[in-house]
Amino acid sequence: TEEAADQTLNQAEVIEDGSKIYVPTKEEVKAYINRMLKSMSKAGNRKPVFYNVSHNGYVAEAYYETTVQGTTYQWYPIGLVSGQTQQGNFLPYVDRYDISFADKVKGFDKKARMIYEFDPADIMYSYMYPAMVRTFRTAGFQWITQFSYDPMDIAYANTEYQTHFLNLAYTPHKAISMKIASEAAQSLKRGASYGSYPQDTLFGEGFRVSYTEDLSELNNGNKFYYSNTTRTQPKDAS
């Protein structure tokens, strides 16, 4: 009815072109998630369910009042689809990963935390991946997934989604950086803090990142990985 339509528009948000979009309430979001969970359970799902909470922070409480087992986030600290190769030192951009409602929402620490996609997009440098993973671990993330898909036929440029560019064939230095980042994800303690840039370019057991050297490095006595030329000597050369 016209009256119902007016009530709906009262719960709407005006966007730039003057049109309106419906903005759900906290209770509606909670009910929607619970209906999905019920449907998945009836379909036989027995695996943990994660829900993306990195948007619509005004209803963040609703996410944590459901029975989802985990929450998901993403990070593109220098943007996406710039149309050009970005230049510069982006390490200060990844000093912190702040979750605005972390200390405001009841039950925040009772749900697992996952990064469902991340990438320092539009760069050719090899120093960023371990730094981002370091910050994710400081923020308490348990699962970290990098966004990239480069079929071999288009891997030279990734024309399908050119803002992402990571593969062993054409960006071996970045691939090694990602390998080092994987080591960091598995060894760095959740919640551990490593200070601010530039102090946090050295972290954990043998990890180092450098903008001036375009370098990711792991040198812990058992493993010596480096993404670019380095003057570092192996901790244990035997």
Predicted feature residues:
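Glycoside hydrolase catalytic-domain groove-lining segments
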Residues: 48-49, 61-120
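Catalytic-core region of carbohydrate-active enzymes that cleave or remodel glycosidic bonds
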Residues: 39-40, 91-153, 166-180
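A solvent-exposed, charged loop/short amphipathic helix patch at secondary-structure junctions
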Residues: 9-23
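Aromatic- and carboxylate-lined catalytic core of secreted/periplasmic carbohydrate-active enzymes
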Residues: 150-238
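Extracytoplasmic/secreted proteins, especially bacterial periplasmic and envelope-associated proteins
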Residues: 24, 28-35, 131, 176, ...
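Acidic, His- and aromatic-enriched active-site or binding-groove loops in soluble protein domains
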Residues: 29, 69-78, 138, 145
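Aromatic-lined carbohydrate-recognition surfaces of secreted/lumenal glycan-active proteins
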Residues: 1-3, 19-61, 112-113, 117, ...
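Short, acidic/polar
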Residues: 54-65, 125-133
